[in-house]
Each structure stands twice: as structure tokens, then as C-alpha cells.
């Protein structure tokens, strides 16, 4: 892509000729500014110069943008010299990548990446820190983890020819012990992720709630009883009455206020602001975002964000355009090159494998086929084609607003052998049309109209 000077073509947000005394949050990029956004980057080896058919076309898309974003959902270190350990709390698998991944991602075109997710501390603080070191040395800006909450929640800045870009990254899906905190009194800070805590409630019909109340009251030591006839707590789960049975979420007010302030702060120091959130809620099975997410995305844009990029469920969810800003509720998987090794002793145990008999690859295959363990059994298997289909989203901005969004359907080699699948290529026409028609259906409830030209989705404003 042709790069223009930082001043040429700029539609500057002037304060009516007045001096900026408050710290403006207006967007201020050169016309033609482009952002590429993709979903989860789960990659274990170098690929930029590899033999994977069709991947070079994807790299061309990544390299052509001013800013290219992905969710960094792995840790990078050399296991031979690593001084950390796999944690008892982990994100469902111990993701690990070779140190060469950092320079390789940079060579592909990635220059900015989110770090806050449920895998950020799979290998402890040591894994988090080593990944940060390698990304820093590779020249990739990253946000969402740090030595304190203040560091993890802060905007990180990328200089481009068309404007300065701020990135903020948070996770609503995270392992409890990975949440960062700031110092208080004599207690030091805790390293970890920028977490947005959610309170989940199960919505049930009134007669269901009464049945649950009877169960609660029959249990020994049921705990304090509330007179509220529309809510109760049973075995640590909150139940509420409502019209539609399902799940509802409420964001922690302190976390949300801190995040909104940091978005405002990040935008005051930049020309363009990306906010990214890792959200599996209500579950990987759902094509729709959880009920908190639309309000969250809109509040973030109101606070100064120019794009909201969601990821987590490993599948596509809908797209909304709000105030001429894109909201991607999930961009699914971009890489699912899950050749991780070592997988850790806990993974062998979970999938009833023997490290003296079975292999890391066989553990990974079992995990992807069976899913993750819960009290009710295994759930969340990722062995369906939908998890190997996504899009590369290319947003072009004119006059500081979204002018066009191009959606390039990709497929990740669902039917290939384990050693070869998980690397994206442009989807063949029939599959591309199917992916885009699904995205049309998922985006329609948000009032978004996607047209299909050849095998590319288009949103024009």
C-alpha cells in the first residue's frame, strides 16, 4: 500500500481555532488509513516463508495495512532454557510457541497485538514476561498484560505514516489467578492481565426459580436467605427470573470505569484507538455475543475508541457499525496451528493419556475432539468446520470515519492432517460465499448490511 505523509490528506479535528485545553479525543488520521483485524493467533512455528499453499496471499493483505492487529493467544519461549512452570490454573491448554515466532509475526505484517486472554498466564508470570520480551525485541506493540493493573490496562502506542495508533486490551474470559492488581499500602502489585470481571446470572422462568428455591431450602446450611422472589443463589450460582431462559452478565463497575478512563487517556495521546476484548461468553457454542457486550462496545466507542475487536469463541460472530466505527463481536480463528509441545502433565491426566506411551500430538488431538472438562463432562470441542472458517477484516477510513469494510473469507484447512491444518488461505468461492452468507445473517440483527462481490464481503458507508 502506498504510504503518504502524516500531514498530507489529513482531516484534522480542529477546536474551532482554539487551543486544546482538555485533551481532545477526536480521531485524526490521514485519509486512506487502513486497519486489518484478525482473530485468535494460535501458532506454534514460523510460517512466513513456509510451504503452505495460499498463505502468501494472506500475508499480502496483512502487510498492506497501516495497522495490522491479532489476538496473541500463545506464549513464546524456549522450553530448554525456560525457568517457569505450567500453572495449575490454565486456559484449557498450555499454549507455547518457539522464540522465532516473534520476528516471523513481524515479517507477516503484524505490528500490534492484544495479550489479555485466558491463556496469558498458562506458563506463569515467567511465560508472560518472556513473551513480552520477545515481542518487544521483534518490534510488535502489545497491550493487555503487565507487572500491575496500571501497566496491563494502559494503552500502548504505534507510530504509522498516517497517524499514531493506541491499543488497549482486556479479557472478560480469564483464569481467576491471572488478574493483575495495583499495589495497596504495603501490599505489592500483582502481575497479570487487564481483566473486566463479570457477574453471571442464570435466567429462568418463575416456576423454575421456585423449584430451585425448594432445593436450596432443603439443603443443610443453605446460607442466608433473601426475600427477593425474583432472585436466589444456589451452590454459588445466581438465578434470576426473566422471559428468556439463558445467561445474563453485569460488568464490574470499578473495572469498567478504569477501562473507560484508560480509553479516554489512550485516545488523548493518539490519533486512532483500537480496543480489543477476549470474550468466550456465553460459550464457544454461541453465534451471538453475550448480553453485556454491545453496551460495552458502544461505551468504549463513546469514550474514544475507533474500533472494537472481539475474539475468544473461535468462531465468527456479527459485525455492527456504531457511529461510523466498526464493532467486531468475534473474528474467530486466524491461526489454529496448534502443534504445541510440551503439553504439560495436567493435559495428559485430563485426557487419560500416559506420557510414557502417548504423544503430545495425541493429547492435542484428544483435546480438540473432546473439548474441555467440566463437572458435567467434556464441552467445547473445536473439531467442527465452523472453527476453521473466518475472515480478514480490512477497514478503510476517510475523513476520520469508516468508509469501507472489506471482508476476505479464509479457511484453515479443516480436513488436513494435524501437522498441516490451522494455517489460513483465501477460501474457494463456494466456501467463501457460505462464510459471508453466515456473516450476513449474524450481522443483520445489528442493522449491518453486507454485500457480496465476487468472493469478498463489503460494507460501504
Swiss-Prot record:
Annotated region (Disordered), positions in chain: 1-21
Annotated Basic and acidic residues bias: 1-19
Transmembrane regions: none
Record flagged with keyword tRNA-binding: no
Pfam families found in the cross-reference section: PGA_cap
Keywords assigned by UniProt, alphabetized: Plasmid
Main function: Could be involved in the biosynthesis of a cell wall component.
Family affiliation: Belongs to the CapA family.
Name by which UniProt lists this protein: Uncharacterized protein y4sH
Species in which this protein is naturally found: Sinorhizobium fredii (strain NBRC 101917 / NGR234)
Lineage: Bacteria, Pseudomonadati, Pseudomonadota, Alphaproteobacteria, Hyphomicrobiales
Amino acid at each position: 500500500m502506498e504510504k503518504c505523509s502524516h500531514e498530507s490528506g489529513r482531516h484534522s479535528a480542529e477546536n474551532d481555532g482554539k487551543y486544546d485545553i482538555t485533551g481532545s479525543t477526536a480521531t485524526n488520521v490521514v485519509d486512506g488509513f487502513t486497519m486489518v483485524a484478525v482473530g485468535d493467533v494460535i501458532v506454534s512455528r514460523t510460517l512466513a516463508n513456509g510451504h503452505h499453499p495460499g498463505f502468501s496471499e494472506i500475508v499480502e493483505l496483512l502487510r498492506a495495512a497501516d495497522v495490522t492487529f491479532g489476538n496473541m493467544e500463545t506464549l513464546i519461549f524456549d522450553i530448554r532454557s525456560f525457568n517457569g512452570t505450567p500453572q495449575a490454573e490454565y486456559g484449557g491448554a498450555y499454549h507455547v510457541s518457539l522464540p522465532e515466532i516473534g520476528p516471523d509475526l513481524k515479517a507477516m505484517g503484524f505490528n500490534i497485538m492484544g495479550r489479555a486472554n485466558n491463556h496469558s498466564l498458562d506458563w506463569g508470570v515467567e511465560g508472560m514476561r518472556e513473551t513480552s520480551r520477545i515481542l518487544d525485541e521483534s518490534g510488535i506493540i502489545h497491550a493487555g498484560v503487565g507487572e500491575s493493573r496500571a501497566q496491563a490496562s494502559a494503552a500502548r502506542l504505534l507510530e504509522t505514516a498516517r497517524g499514531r495508533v493506541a491499543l488497549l486490551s482486556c479479557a472478560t474470559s480469564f483464569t481467576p489467578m491471572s488478574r493483575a492488581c495495583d499495589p495497596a499500602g504495603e501490599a505489592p502489585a500483582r502481575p497479570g492481565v487487564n481483566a473486566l470481571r463479570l457477574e453471571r446470572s442464570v435466567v429462568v422462568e418463575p416456576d423454575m426459580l421456585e423449584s430451585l428455591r425448594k432445593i436450596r431450602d432443603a439443603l443443610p446450611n443453605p446460607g442466608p436467605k433473601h426475600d427477593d422472589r425474583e432472585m436466589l443463589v444456589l451452590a454459588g450460582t445466581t438465578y434470576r427470573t426473566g422471559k428468556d431462559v439463558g445467561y445474563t452478565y453485569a460488568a464490574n463497575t470499578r473495572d469498567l470505569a478504569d477501562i473507560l478512563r484508560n480509553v479516554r487517556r489512550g485516545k488523548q495521546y493518539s490519533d486512532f484507538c483500537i480496543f480489543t476484548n477476549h470474550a468466550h461468553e456465553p460459550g464457544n457454542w454461541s453465534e451471538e455475543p453475550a448480553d453485556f457486550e454491545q453496551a460495552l462496545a458502544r461505551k468504549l466507542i463513546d469514550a474514544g475508541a475507533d474500533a472494537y475487536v472481539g475474539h475468544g469463541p473461535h468462531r465468527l460472530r456479527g459485525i455492527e457499525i456504531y457511529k461510523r466505527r466498526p464493532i467486531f463481536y468475534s473474528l474467530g480463528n486466524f491461526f489454529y496451528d496448534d502443534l504445541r509441545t510440551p503439553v504439560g502433565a495436567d493435559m495428559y491426566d485430563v485426557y487419560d493419556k500416559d506420557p510414557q506411551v502417548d504423544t503430545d500430538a495425541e493429547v492435542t488431538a484428544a483435546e480438540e475432539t473432546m473439548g474441555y472438562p467440566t463437572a458435567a463432562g467434556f464441552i467445547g470441542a473445536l473439531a467442527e468446520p465452523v472453527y476453521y472458517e473466518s475472515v480478514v477484516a480490512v477497514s478503510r477510513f476517510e475523513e476520520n470515519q469508516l468508509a469501507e469494510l472489506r471482508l476476505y473469507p479464509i479457511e484453515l484447512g479443516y480436513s488436513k492432517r494435524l501437522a498441516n491444518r490451522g494455517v489460513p488461505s483465501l477460501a474457494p468461492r463456494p466456501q467463501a460465499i457460505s462464510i459471508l452468507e453466515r456473516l450476513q445473517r449474524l450481522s443483520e440483527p445489528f442493522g449491518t448490511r453486507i454485500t457480496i462481490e465476487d468472493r469478498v464481503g463489503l460494507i460501504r458507508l
